[in-house]
Curated annotation (Swiss-Prot):
One of its GO terms (molecular function) is chorismate lyase activity. One of its GO terms (cellular component) is cytosol. Removes the pyruvyl group from chorismate, with concomitant aromatization of the ring, to provide 4-hydroxybenzoate (4HB) for the ubiquinone pathway. Its EC number is 4.1.3.40. The keyword Transferase does not apply. This is Probable chorismate pyruvate-lyase. The keyword Cytoplasm applies. Keywords: Cytoplasm, Lyase, Pyruvate, Ubiquinone biosynthesis. Substrate binds at residues 66, 104, 169. It is an enzyme of class 4 (lyase). It catalyses: chorismate = 4-hydroxybenzoate + pyruvate. The lineage of its organism: Bacteria, Pseudomonadati, Pseudomonadota, Betaproteobacteria, Burkholderiales. Its main location: cytoplasm.
């Protein structure tokens, strides 16, 4: 079954958020008073065959992976997973190793010589391995189960010096900036259940 498509099936403001080009981190930062990155894991991990195929490296079994939660005013809103071949994480993409809690966007949109493929979109169903992976990571990081059985997601491949980097972003929060006013003058988000830091 094909998961990823060129078609963005979301509606309204959520569709605009999921389909927006440019830096998602910058867009999130503009939606609240404080934007932050929580690193969940970083290092060598087994890859899904679909990830390896998206990288054009179908035989790749293990890659360098960075997983984070993107937060707005302390509320977790997006799960992001970045994947590249291990040698590339020591070469063209070595800067991702030292990001710490800085967003990957600092590298992707702040430097020259990086190309990006068009966005692909998916609605991750609760029975899918990707949904289960995100749900497990989300619960471990926030202490809260995912409220949505279907998760809007997008991905694209960034290439630098012939080295591909796959970036997937899952819009996992049921109430998030795509339902708020996207302006820095907003005093704060509506009342939401607080998650663990």
């Amino acid at each position: 079954m094909k998961v990823w498509s060129k078609r963005n099936v979301q509606r309204g403001n959520r569709k605009r958020w999921v389909g927006a080009t440019g830096s998602l981190s910058a867009r999130l930062a503009a939606a609240g008073q404080r934007f932050s990155v929580q690193v969940l894991s970083q290092g060598l991990q087994a890859l899904d065959p679909d990830e390896a195929s998206a990288l054009g490296l179908s035989r790749l079994k293990v890659g360098y992976v960075r997983e984070v939660l993107l937060r707005v005013d302390e509320v977790a809103v997006v799960f992001a997973r970045s994947v590249t071949a291990h040698p590339h994480s020591q070469g063209p993409w070595r800067s991702i190793r030292g990001l710490g809690t800085r967003p990957l966007a600092d590298v992707l949109f702040g430097q020259h010589g990086i190309a990006r493929t068009p966005l692909q979109f998916a609605s991750l169903q609760v029975a899918s391995s990707l949904h289960r992976h995100v749900a497990h990571a989300w619960l471990g990081a926030t202490g809260a189960a995912l409220a949505s059985r279907v998760l809007p997601a997008r991905r694209s491949v960034f290439t630098r010096g012939a080295a591909p980097l796959l970036v997937m972003e899952v819009f996992a929060a049921p109430h998030a900036p795509w339902g708020w006013l996207t302006t820095k003058t907003r005093r704060g988000p509506p009342a939401l259940p607080r998650t663990k830091p």
